[in-house]
């Protein structure tokens, strides 16, 4: 089963969940119309299962849906965007 990705703005993060279990998270700060991604982590038991990719894709899809820009300070988010050029348009040009 593919995890669901949910924005948890009060915690400043997107979570990948399987029911009540958090499989991964990507932390962010909002700065105006920019979402600054600062850190991503995946539960060790879920590593290598695609949770990180599902998480970043879901977070960036949400950024796009809200007309925002992404600032990938997190190396995982940055490398994911580099491997998925169809998301490169979301990256704030000042980064």
Task: Indicate where each model-derived feature is located.
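Conserved N-terminal entry element of GNAT/NAT acetyltransferase domains
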Residues: 1-7
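Structural motif
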Residues: 8-10, 31
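Conserved beta-hairpin
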Residues: 12-23
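General beta-strand recognition
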Residues: 15, 34-36
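Conserved beta-strand in the GNAT
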Residues: 21-29, 36
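A short, internal acetyl-CoA/4′-phosphopantetheine-binding micro-motif in the GNAT/acyltransferase core
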Residues: 41-47
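Conserved acetyl-CoA-binding loop-helix of GNAT-fold acetyltransferases
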Residues: 48-59
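C-terminal structural segments of small proteins and small subunits
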Residues: 61-95
């Amino acid at each position: 089963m593919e995890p669901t990705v949910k924005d948890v703005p009060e915690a400043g993060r997107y979570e990948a969940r399987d029911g009540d279990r958090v499989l991964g998270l990507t932390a962010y700060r909002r700065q105006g119309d920019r979402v600054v991604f600062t850190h991503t982590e995946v539960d060790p038991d879920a590593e290598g299962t695609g949770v990180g990719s599902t998480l970043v894709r879901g977070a960036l899809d949400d950024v796009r849906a809200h007309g925002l820009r992404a600032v990938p300070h997190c190396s995982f988010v940055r490398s994911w965007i580099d491997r998925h050029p169809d998301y490169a348009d979301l990256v704030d040009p000042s980064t």
